Structure formats: C-alpha cells, structure tokens
Design a protein with these regions (language model features):
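Conserved catalytic core of the tyrosine transesterase superfamily
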Residues: 1-244
C-alpha cells in the first residue's frame, strides 16, 4: 500500500477527543503528573507502585516486558539502560532517566536488600507467605484502576479504564510532541514496521498542521494547477511527516 493511499484512508477516521484520537488512548502530561502523585510513598507498597508506573512511562515497555525484567537487565551506570525482551524474541535497550534510577535504587533497598546489581531475581514480585512469585498482569491492572479512581477526584478526565498500555502510548506521544523523530519513536517502541508508529503522527493534529505549513512554505509560488496532494509520491509524504 502506498503512503499516499494510506493517508487518504486515515483521513476517513472521525476525530474524537484527544485521548481517543486515531484509536490511541493516551494521557496528557498534566494527567500523567496527577496520576503519579497518587501512591503514598511513605509506605513500602506506595514506593513499589510509584516505581512500576514510572517505569511503564519512562521505558514505554509493554506490561509483560516490564514484569519479565530482572535486576541483571538493568545497567547501573552513568548512561543507565534496561534490556527488555520484546515481540519476536528480540531484545532492545531502552535509556532510563536519572530520576528513574533514583527510584529504582530506593526500591531496591526495600525489596531487594543485599542483592547485587547482577542478581537474576525479577525486579517486581509478590510475596506469598515468604515465597516470591512474579507479579501478574492482573495485579498491575487492579493497581492502576485504584490510582485512576483516586486521581479522578482532582482530574475528572482521567480514563475510567486505565490500563498499562496508556503509559506506553502516552510516553510515545509526548516524545513525538516534543520533537523526537518518528523513526526514533518507532525504534524506541520496538515496532517492527514504521507504519505501525504512523498512528502517532495522525493523532497529533497540531503537529501535522505545522508540518504541512512548513512543507508548503517553499512551494507557495507554484500555480494551484501544478500541485495535487493526491499525486504526492511516497518519498515526499515521508519527508512531510518527518520520516526522511
């Protein structure tokens, strides 16, 4: 399928509120800040829950990728990264922000005391009668719903069906809105096909408008009859959307 035809098909999708545009559900940066303020960090559980949400957002990892993360998959260095095993059994290395590393170290002191940075233990786990077990997807979803309900008191727009993928979509959209090239966003998300990531470009209407204005500035002298959007070739469309 050509990009020209692809974008014509996208234009048929009706616009909805921001968090539902083009099938993507994501939080605004303000909503994310309210959500991350909900855990009680004076408690051990609150420290764990906050780290889990921060890592879902900072890494953009899928929930199972994060729950499968082991301590030895974290690079504790001046340029910290986490190694996640994604779809197709492919590893990718994701940069982690210094503030996130501070939360990881704080969490490690409480949940992994005495364990070194190369331990093979799962980073997140549940303790049942002294026996550790990997944390389940269901546990995370229940936890997120709890904090979403709490956040809704001061942020009515908080989704009622908050789920782990909201964090992945939100981080990708925020990076794109702040100027990250869509090709880099695609690599960061671990998408095998760049077209999968194009949905973020379609969802952000304001950035799309600015990109079109910028691309049109140099051709304003061309007669209207010489320019037809339906005949733009794939390479031109890719440059228009920041893919070249």
């Amino acid at each position: 399928i050509s990009l020209a035809r692809y974008y014509k098909e996208l234009e048929k999708i009706p616009w909805k509120r921001e968090t539902e545009s083009a099938g993507i559900e994501f939080l605004s940066e303000a909503e994310m800040k309210v959500l991350l303020a909900q855990p009680d960090t004076a408690t051990k559980k609150g420290i764990r829950d906050l780290l889990l949400m921060i890592m879902l957002y900072d890494t953009g990892a899928r929930i199972q990728e994060l729950l499968n993360l082991r301590i030895c998959d974290i690079q504790f260095s001046k340029s910290p990264t986490v190694k996640v095993l994604g779809k197709g059994s492919k590893y990718r290395f994701i940069p982690v922000m210094p503030k996130t590393m501070e939360h990881i170290r704080k969490y490690m002191k409480l949940y992994h005391p005495g364990e070194g940075n190369y331990a093979n233990a799962f980073l997140f786990y549940t303790d049942r009668k002294g026996v550790r077990a990997p944390m389940s997807d269901d546990n995370v979803r229940k936890m997120l719903r709890h904090y979403a309900d709490s956040a809704r008191a001061s942020c009515p727009s908080m989704p009622t069906n908050l789920h782990p993928h909201h964090f992945r979509h939100s981080r990708a959209m925020h990076l794109y809105q702040h100027g990250m090239d869509l090709a880099l966003v695609s690599q960061w998300l671990g998408h095998a096909n760049l077209e999968t990531t194009l949905i973020y470009a379609h969802a952000d209407t304001e950035m799309k408008r600015k990109a079109i204005e910028k691309a049109s500035a140099g051709i304003c002298e061309i007669d209207a009859g010489e320019s037809n959007p339906d005949t733009l070739d794939d390479d031109t469309l890719k440059r228009l959307y920041g893919l070249r």
